[in-house]
From Swiss-Prot:
Name this polypeptide is given: Aspartate carbamoyltransferase catalytic subunit
Binding locations of L-aspartate: K85, R168, R230
Pfam families hit by this protein: OTCace (PF00185), OTCace_N (PF02729)
Domain of life: Bacteria
UniProt key word Transferase: yes
Family stated for the protein in its record: Belongs to the aspartate/ornithine carbamoyltransferase superfamily. ATCase family.
E.C. number(s) listed in UniProt: 2.1.3.2
Annotated source species: Klebsiella pneumoniae (strain 342)
Keyword NAD annotated: no
Enzyme class name: transferase
Keywords associated with the record: Pyrimidine biosynthesis, Transferase
Cited HAMAP family: Asp_carb_tr (MF_00001)
Length: 311
């Protein structure tokens, strides 16, 4: 059966309907249960990381290899013509698109991934993070993990903690969960790092409940998912970073009173916002969450590069 994601650019989580999300998650579950090492055997995929990455880059490239694709690209733009010779992003993408079947791209500038689609010659571009804007594939693995642990994506109480202003993962995840009914959001952040108004306006327009809080303890007993984020030092001036970095820290003792099946998620890397004693609790699920990135990204690559997919 033809699939709606074939040859589609995936730049924002809003490029995917609820039905698209459900298709990706169902495909991820099938690939987790039954690996397909030759599914992309004759495909070449570019992995273009203009910004530092560990989990996203390695997860994407592992996904490509495990599906049998050939992988080309770079993890540091400083040694490319763009970095050394001043080539434009448009020209870089125009050239790369003549070599490959798909482009996975991370870039520090908001909107760079969308710009790349204008110069890719129809070759699908998958956004692996563009500045503080969007991180759709992180959201796919987040949704996959939530569905696995909670058994649903509806009627959830979800708390998001930390840097909600620059944290692209929380922007994308909120927009995705807003496509499913009955979810409620609790936003816990310093005033300087509050959730952007456009996200709150979107929730209001959809009639989705949300509230602002000043402490994790305020909501611990109510939530199904506690989504922690780090304060992003690279996006703040030093004085602002010093003021907010330790404001919201989760310790094992804080989990007393949490629901039995509540899971703590984190897009990683963590710095100081989750102490290591949390790792030993049954609530900690961030390492399993990271592992699910393989299956979510495999699913997306498989769907974007196959007009028909029967697993």
């Amino acid at each position: 059966m033809a699939n709606p994601l074939y040859q589609k650019h995936i730049i924002s989580i809003n490029d995917l309907s609820r039905e698209d999300l459900e298709l990706v998650l169902a495909t991820a579950a099938k690939l987790k249960a039954n690996p397909q090492p030759e599914l992309l055997k004759h495909k070449v995929i570019a992995s273009c990381f203009f910004e530092a990455s560990t989990r996203t880059r390695l997860s994407f490239e592992t996904s490509m290899h495990r599906l049998g694709a050939s992988v080309v690209g770079f993890s540091d733009s400083a040694n490319t013509s763009l970095g050394k010779k001043g080539e434009t992003l448009a020209d870089t993408i125009s050239v790369i698109s003549t070599y490959v079947d798909a482009i996975v791209m991370r870039h520090p500038q908001e909107g760079a991934a969308r710009l790349a689609t204008e110069f890719s010659g129809g070759v699908p571009v998958l956004n692996a993070g563009d500045g503080a804007n969007q991180h759709p594939t992180q959201t796919l693995l987040d949704l996959f993990t939530i569905q696995e642990t909670q058994g649903r994506l509806e009627n959830l109480n979800v708390a998001m903690v930390g840097d909600l202003k620059y944290g692209r993962t929380v922007h994308s995840l909120t927009q995705a969960l807003a496509k499913f009914s009955g979810n409620r959001f609790y936003f816990i952040a310093p005033d300087a790092l509050a959730m952007p108004q456009y996200i709150l306006d979107m929730l209001d327009e959809k009639g989705i409940a949300w509230s602002l809080h000043s402490a994790i303890d305020d909501v611990m007993a109510e939530v199904d998912i506690l989504y922690m984020t780090r304060v992003q030092k690279e996006r703040l001036d030093p004085s602002e970073y010093a003021n907010v970095k330790a404001q919201f820290v989760l310790r094992a003792a804080d989990l007393e009173g949490a629901r039995a099946n509540m899971k703590v998620l984190h897009p990683l890397p963590r710095i100081d916002e989750i102490t290591t004693d949390v790792d030993k609790t049954p609530h900690a699920w961030y390492f399993q969450q990271a592992g699910n990135g393989i299956f979510a990204r495999q699913a997306l690559l498989a769907l974007v590069l196959n007009s028909e997919l029967a697993l």
